[in-house]
Amino acid sequence: MASGKPKKKNPRLASGRKRVRQDVKINAANTSLRSKYRTAVKNVEKAVVAGDKAKATELFAKMQAVVDTVADKGIFHKNKAARDKSRLSTKVKALAAIAA
């Protein structure tokens, strides 16, 4: 049985070959940023679950910068970024209310 994806043809034109080279670099950069985004969100969620208000607040501030950067570059849609920030903000504020 054949594998799922057909083998890609190599581009003939120089511009096509250049595009392939660029795509490899861009894909690696996007993958790295996507991973950084998810890690930042997970770290805030872990701090919230642990009940650590100070750490959650600190990590949330750092997470916002990462989320905004990724949204500006178009790796994740800006509405998804806003939604994630809003949901985590609510959790961090609830944690602060419980601790107070």
Swiss-Prot record:
Region called Disordered, residue ranges: 1-21
GO molecular function terms listed in the Swiss-Prot or TrEMBL record: small ribosomal subunit rRNA binding; structural constituent of ribosome
Matches recorded under SUPFAM superfamilies: Ribosomal protein S20
Keyword Nucleus assigned: no
Ranges of biased composition (kind: Basic residues): 1-20
One cellular-component annotation, GO: small ribosomal subunit
Gene Ontology biological process: translation
Keywords annotated in UniProt: Ribonucleoprotein, Ribosomal protein, RNA-binding, rRNA-binding
Xref: PANTHER family: 30S RIBOSOMAL PROTEIN S20 (PTHR33398), SMALL RIBOSOMAL SUBUNIT PROTEIN BS20C (PTHR33398:SF1)
Family matches, as NCBIfam families: S20
Role this protein plays: Binds directly to 16S ribosomal RNA.
Family: Belongs to the bacterial ribosomal protein bS20 family.
Protein name: Small ribosomal subunit protein bS20
UniProt source species: Albidiferax ferrireducens (strain ATCC BAA-621 / DSM 15236 / T118) (Rhodoferax ferrireducens)
Native organism taxonomy: Bacteria, Pseudomonadati, Pseudomonadota, Betaproteobacteria, Burkholderiales
Recorded name of the encoding gene: rpsT
